[in-house]
């Protein structure tokens, strides 16, 4: 409690005594903590023979909030989940990708274990940081894995798009803007930001345009890789406060990126061909090993054999590949996996739409043939899990438009014909038999 509050208590006691003893109801009331009168504050809250003003309530809230946050930070540091626990929680949100989950769980566990041990004295071995590179097709779950990890560990998290980044001095975003976004996520708390996670998406789009040096600068390709090197490895980045523009007279926030975990992700379309060319390349002469081209091999299977040299041939510079020592590849999602994604995760799309309909007191049912049809459409569009929502939005648009105006609908049923667009959703009305709209004439 502030000294001013303590010093004012005797005065307040005298005032309260005067008020009680002197039968004058017109006397002022005073805050029991700071001694301010009811006219000096916005609100005076009365208790059994005591009063507290709104300013003291705010002060108490701030003190309690700080103590709770410190206690939570300490407990989270001591309660770092094991790799198996991390993988188990990822299973609740991400279907399949078991190998990628295992790699991520171990890498993240070791990273934060390293942070928890860094302040201990007597440790002669300094542990290095292991940033992560996720390689997988569009819609396979790269971003979702990173988001779920950050939510699980309760650390600041931001997503950056590599395609918008350019070298400093050119039109576009500087790499320091990534750290600025991370600071915004934690209300510019530098200490919190320095233990956060940054996910850089579309990292394959900043590959070198060609192996041959050119007269023109590659400001959005190799130039960005060079700019990201120090940031990812660990440097002190100067960031303008509160998102302002940089100018010479400005004071900058200094953010140390050594303990920020960087996860880079990309589809790397065409990388499988680089891998296959390497694995099928044979020698010359009688002692050469004879290898046949592996026809019909899935992209995910090829990507599992990726090596750093393949990434360099794809267009990443060797120094950049070296800063991302942990490689995790994700498989293409098949029809069965897409059907699981629609129904099994905690935040599955069918559960989300069912919740929206429940708010209108209507049950929503997806039949199994409808789920298969949605999965088939997503496979045809080659958008992976990302395309599932757009398909369902298109199917349910008219129904969601009509339902709020109809008070007698109790249930909506979606089957395969609705997904294929040959019929409308089946609406079941209260106290009536199900009525389906007639199918169109053949």
Curated annotation (Swiss-Prot):
One of its GO terms (biological process) is proteolysis involved in protein catabolic process. GO terms for cellular component: HslUV protease complex. The lineage of its organism: Bacteria, Pseudomonadati, Pseudomonadota, Gammaproteobacteria, Pseudomonadales. Residues 19-72 form the ClpX-type ZB domain. Keywords: ATP-binding, Chaperone, Metal-binding, Nucleotide-binding, Zinc. CDD domains: RecA-like_ClpX. Component of the ClpX-ClpP complex. Forms a hexameric ring that, in the presence of ATP, binds to fourteen ClpP subunits assembled into a disk-like structure with a central cavity, resembling the structure of eukaryotic proteasomes. ATP binds at residues 137-144. GO terms for molecular function: ATP binding; ATP hydrolysis activity; ATP-dependent protein folding chaperone; protein dimerization activity; unfolded protein binding; zinc ion binding. This is ATP-dependent Clp protease ATP-binding subunit ClpX. Zn(2+) binds at residues 31, 34, 53, 56. InterPro entries: AAA+_ATPase, ATP-dep_Clp_protease_ClpX, ATPase_AAA_core, Clp_ATPase_C, Clp_protease_ATP-bd_su_ClpX, ClpX_bact, P-loop_NTPase, Znf_CppX_C4. HAMAP family: ClpX. Belongs to the ClpX chaperone family. SUPFAM superfamilies: Glucocorticoid receptor-like (DNA-binding domain), P-loop containing nucleoside triphosphate hydrolases.
């Amino acid at each position: 409690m502030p000294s001013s509050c303590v010093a004012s208590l005797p005065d307040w006691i005298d005032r309260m005594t005067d008020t009680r003893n002197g039968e004058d109801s017109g006397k002022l009331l005073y805050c029991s903590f700071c001694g301010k009168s009811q006219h000096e504050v916005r609100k005076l809250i009365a208790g059994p023979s005591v009063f507290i003003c709104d300013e003291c309530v705010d002060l108490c809230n701030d003190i309690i909030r700080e103590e709770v946050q410190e206690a939570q930070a300490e407990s989270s540091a001591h309660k770092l989940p094991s790799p198996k626990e991390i993988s188990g929680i990822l299973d609740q949100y991400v279907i399949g990708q078991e190998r990628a989950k295992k790699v991520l769980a171990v890498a993240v566990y070791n990273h934060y274990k390293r942070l928890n041990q860094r302040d201990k004295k007597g440790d002669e071995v300094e542990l290095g940081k292991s940033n992560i590179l996720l390689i997988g097709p569009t819609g396979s779950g790269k971003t979702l894995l990173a988001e779920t990890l950050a939510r699980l560990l309760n650390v600041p998290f931001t997503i950056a798009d590599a395609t918008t980044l350019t070298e400093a001095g050119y039109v576009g975003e500087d790499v320091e803007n990534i750290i600025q976004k991370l600071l915004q996520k934690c209300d510019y708390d530098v200490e919190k930001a320095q233990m956060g996670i940054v996910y850089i998406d579309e990292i394959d789009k900043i590959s070198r345009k060609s192996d041959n040096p050119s007269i023109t600068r590659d400001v959005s390709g190799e130039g960005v890789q060079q700019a990201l090197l120090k940031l990812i490895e660990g440097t002190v980045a100067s960031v303008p406060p509160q998102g302002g523009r940089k100018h010479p007279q400005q004071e900058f926030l200094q953010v140390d990126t050594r303990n920020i975990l960087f996860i880079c992700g990309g589809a790397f379309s065409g990388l499988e061909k680089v891998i296959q060319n390497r694995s099928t390349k044979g020698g010359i002469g009688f002692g050469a090993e004879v290898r046949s081209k592996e026809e019909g091999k899935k992209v995910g299977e090829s990507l599992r054999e990726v090596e750093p040299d393949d990434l360099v041939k794809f267009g990443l510079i060797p120094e950049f590949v070296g800063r991302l020592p942990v490689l995790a590849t994700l498989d293409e999602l098949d029809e069965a996996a897409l059907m699981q994604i629609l129904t099994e995760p905690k935040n599955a799309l069918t559960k989300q739409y069912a919740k929206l309909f429940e708010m209108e007191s209507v049950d929503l049912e997806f039949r199994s043939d409808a789920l298969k049809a949605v999965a088939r459409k997503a496979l045809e569009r080659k958008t992976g899990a990302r395309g599932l929502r757009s398909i369902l939005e298109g199917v349910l648009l008219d129904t969601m438009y009509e339902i709020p105006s109809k008070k007698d609908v109790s249930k909506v049923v979606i089957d395969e014909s609705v997904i294929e667009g040959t019929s409308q959703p089946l609406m079941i009305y209260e106290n009536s038999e199900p009525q389906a709209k007639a199918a169109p004439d053949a």
